[in-house]
Curated annotation (Swiss-Prot):
One example GO MF annotation: NADH dehydrogenase (ubiquinone) activity
Record region (Disordered): 248-276
Taxonomic lineage of the native organism: Eukaryota, Fungi, Dikarya, Ascomycota, Saccharomycotina
Subcellular location field: Mitochondrion inner membrane
Keywords attached to this entry: Electron transport, Membrane, Mitochondrion, Mitochondrion inner membrane, NAD, Oxidoreductase, Respiratory chain, Transit peptide, Translocase, Transport, Ubiquinone
Signal peptide: none
HAMAP family xrefs: NDH1_NuoC
InterPro entries: NADH_DH_suC (IPR010218), NADH_quin_OxRdtase_su_C/D-like (IPR037232), NADH_UbQ_OxRdtase_30kDa_su (IPR001268), NADH_UbQ_OxRdtase_CS (IPR020396)
Gene Ontology cellular component terms for the protein in this record: mitochondrial inner membrane
Descriptive protein name: Probable NADH-ubiquinone oxidoreductase 30.4 kDa subunit, mitochondrial
Coiled-coil ranges from the UniProt annotation: none
Amino acid sequence: MISRTLLKRTVPASRLLRSFTTSNVRLSAHEEDLVNVNNLPRPKPTENYVPLINPTEKYKVQIEELHKFGTYIMSCLPKYIQQFSVWKDELTIYVAPSAIRPVMSYLKNHTSCQFKAVMDITAADYPSRTNRFDVVYNLLSDRHNSRIRVKTYANETSPVPSVTPLFNGANWYERETYDLFGVFFVGHPDLRRIMTDYGFEGHPLRKDFPTTGYTEVRYDEEKKRVIYEPLELTQAWRNFTVGSSVWEPVGEGKDFTPESFKLPTPQPEPEQEEKK
């Protein structure tokens, strides 16, 4: 132990009173022996070396495993799955609307899948197609720490079976997709709007929906309440034909998708003739 007389000679009294541990006292007693880090010699700078990673080999292991898994799923469900694709570390399978429930039930309950959580359900609008909507399901497997995407198709008149009986979390996702795109889900317990107001006209995320909407919401001083009025605009671009928009670029544009990843559009199932 350090004697009190030595501490009184080497350490000021004010510092000694504020020191609650012996380590602080020892450091204060030998401040001259401490090395000043700022005065140490610095190593000479060298050239920065960053290893080059080929983008095609970055996901090489994941792509091979996902291709095996996609092939395995197609071999188990050849009647329902039309095709599958792998992009980087993402696996997507394409099915017909009538196959949604069998495929989702398989992905949820099969031992090799265990995709028990639906993370998102959304859609994309392609007005030039016969089946203009791509309905997308994103699933998560906690057990295998993996994700999968399921895609199907629909239009304004053809509905899609609801997966709410399989996934309780799909309830609001399907309502949101119906509200914003107009995709109808058969078997949904409460299919009504969830994002827009009561009596809203149209579906905002469709490509043919005007950017200004159809009605104007404002507060009326005379009636002392919020009212809805039809818009009176003179813009020529307010009403445009299906498949065109004022925000489209000039020309067809360029498609940067690699040839190996371009997939044909799934064809709809042939209508079955009713037996007389």
